[in-house]
Amino acid sequence: RRRGIPGLGGWFTSREEAGGGPMLDVGVHFLDLSMWLTGFPEPLTASATSHRVFGHRKDYTYLGMWGTTPKPGGPFTVEDLLCGFVRFKGGISLRLEAAWACNSAPSAVVDILGDKGGLHLLPELEFYGQKGGNLIDVKPHLKKISGYVAELEHFLDCIRRRRKPMATGEQGVKVQRIIDALYKSAKLGKEVKV
């Protein structure tokens, strides 16, 4: 987000109550998606920096915020930007940023870069690779579906047919271990083991 700290000055911007800022609010979803797309590799180390620049400023100007009415002077003990890097077994690495407020164009990007090709996922799926001696760019035409509806249908299918859910508790724990390591690294100012 460019400028849009949710619930500024309330519980949502209190580390003691919310646990963290944009990494826990929006970054977790991109981390989880990246992990899912790469088969949930085993994380080894994490390195991060976090910044608290805008939320406490009296002259903070924003584009829009949801949640409660902003309370200037209220608690702001979370980051408004976290930049991280995670190393995984098998030579996989992940770079991520999560922001509520920064001086940049708003963006939501997920790129997977591999030796045989690359995927750009947002806002539309694109594949980049090589076929024979030619570089190829492919934009597949996919049926548009509602992610929320698909999630609910999968959830109901798991209950009705006693199937294992695509997203498991173990995967959630792995994602949370990475987030905890990113926050620890930012606090200590060095790379840490996950």
Question: What is each model feature region?
Answer:
Residues 31, 78-82, 176:
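Conserved glycosyltransferase catalytic-site signature
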Residues 19-22, 71-72, 139-143, 161-169:
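Active-site rim elements
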Residues 1-75, 189:
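Predominantly a Rossmann-like dinucleotide-binding segment in NAD(P)-dependent oxidoreductases
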Residues 30-31, 149-153, 179-180:
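A general structural signal for well-ordered alpha-helical segments in protein cores
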Residues 89, 133, 155-194:
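C-terminal helix-rich "cap/oligomerization" subdomain common to oxidoreductases
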Residues 37-41, 118-122, 182-185:
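Phosphate/oxyanion-binding loops and surfaces in catalytic or ligand/nucleic-acid-binding neighborhoods
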Residues 25, 150, 167:
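Residue-level signal for the nucleotide or nucleotide-sugar donor/cofactor binding architecture
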Residues 57, 71-151:
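NAD(P)-dinucleotide binding in Rossmann-like oxidoreductases
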